[in-house]
UniProtKB/Swiss-Prot annotation:
Region of interest (Disordered), ranges: 114-142
Subcellular location: Host membrane; Virion
Subcellular location, principal: host cell
Sugar-bearing residue positions: N88
Protein name: Transmembrane protein B169L
GO terms for cellular component: host cell membrane; membrane; virion component
Length: 164
């Protein structure tokens, strides 16, 4: 189907259920779907008569009603809302409006959270500069680190699985 045709149908439907006298009740999609369902059911049962048997007639009516309600909700929610959002707004407008609705901040700009500031190091904490080539009198070569035996990580996390 042509995109403009679908968007035109959706805009027409939107204009119909947002008329000023009916604006409060017809903006609720559930009420619109119920009204359309009732109209379709009346027309359906007027045109096509289900079987005469009472039990079969009731079952058929229930199945048809469930199918019609499911189709109407599918049409209303999927086609009307999503196609209007896709064809009447750009993706960026949708994203910006959803962010605006989520935070309700309006036009105020929220500054990004800055990382905690690190205080300046004190003079005695800074390493002293040693001129190249000279060694202080108290200089000692670094001692090798004493290494401990490593324990596998799996045994630390779940020792019961490996002891079996």
């Amino acid at each position: 189907m042509n995109v403009d045709f679908i968007a035109g149908i959706n805009n027409l439907g939107e204009k119909i259920y947002t008329c000023e006298p009916f604006k409060t009740s017809f903006q609720n999609p559930f009420i619109v779907a119920l009204i359309i369902t009732a109209v379709v059911l009346v027309v359906f049962f007027a045109i096509c008569n289900p079987p005469v048997d009472k039990k079969r007639k009731t079952k058929t009516a229930i199945y048809i009603y469930i199918c019609i309600v499911a189709l109407l909700f599918l049409h209303y929610y999927v086609l009307n809302h999503q196609l209007n959002d896709i064809y009447n707004k750009s993706n960026m407008d949708v994203i910006v409006s959803s962010i605006h609705d989520k935070y309700k901040g309006g036009d105020e700009i929220i500054p990004p959270v800055s990382p905690p500031s690190v205080p300046d190091e004190l003079e005695e904490d800074r390493p002293k500069m040693i001129p190249a080539g000279s060694k202080p009198a108290d200089f000692k070569p670094a001692e090798p680190a004493v290494s401990k035996p490593l324990i596998p990580l799996q045994e630390v996390i779940m020792p019961s699985q490996y002891n079996n």
